[in-house]
């Protein structure tokens, strides 16, 4: 299964956010094992650096968060065409619209997020991490990538 990982889920793992870390850690284990191919947008990397630096007050830890993301994830390019599709999409949040446009451009199976409200009119299925597990556990999806 090829999925775009929303920034909030990625930060749950990188910053070990207590309420959400266990699901995020399981997701990263599935990525490491090849059961899931994780994607992030190029713009997510700048968000990760900024938020991790603000949260940890450490440039080195922010750099480590970006490095871990670059190691584990495929990067969806954000070019003019993606930005224009996102802008004309009608989604209220431009950042979320960029993620949807990237997922469409890459032909991804789903977007994983804790903020499904931001993706209400997405043409790509929007799932929580737990919903993703349920799909993977379905008999006909035992290991589709």
Annotate each language-model stretch with its function.
Residues 25, 47-74:
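Active-site-proximal, substrate-binding regions of enzyme catalytic domains
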Residues 1-40, 54-60, 121, 127-145:
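Short, well-structured N-terminal submotif of metal-dependent ribonuclease cores
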Residues 74-116, 143-145:
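Active-site neighborhoods of divalent-metal-dependent phosphate/nucleic-acid chemistry enzymes
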Residues 71, 107, 122-123:
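Short, structured coil segments at secondary-structure junctions
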Residues 9, 47-51, 85:
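A general alpha-helix detector
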Residues 44, 65, 116, 132:
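Residue-level "edge-of-site" marker
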Residues 46, 85, 118-119, 134:
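Positions that flank functional sites
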Residues 40-44, 82:
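Short, conserved alpha-helical segments within structured domains
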């Amino acid at each position: 299964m090829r999925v775009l990982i929303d920034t909030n889920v990625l930060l749950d793992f990188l910053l070990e956010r207590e309420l959400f870390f266990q699901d995020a850690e399981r997701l990263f284990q599935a990525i490491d094992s090849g059961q899931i191919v994780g994607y992030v947008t190029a713009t997510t990397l700048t968000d990760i650096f900024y938020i991790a630096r603000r949260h940890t007050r450490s440039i080195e830890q922010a750099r480590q968060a970006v490095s871990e993301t670059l190691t584990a994830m495929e990067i969806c390019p954000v070019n003019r065409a993606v930005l224009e599709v996102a802008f004309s999409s009608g989604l209220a949040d431009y950042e979320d619209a960029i993620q949807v446009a990237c997922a469409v451009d890459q032909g991804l199976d789903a977007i994983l997020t804790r903020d499904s409200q931001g993706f209400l009119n997405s043409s790509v299925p929007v799932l929580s991490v737990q919903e993703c597990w349920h799909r993977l556990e379905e008999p006909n999806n035992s290991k589709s990538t």
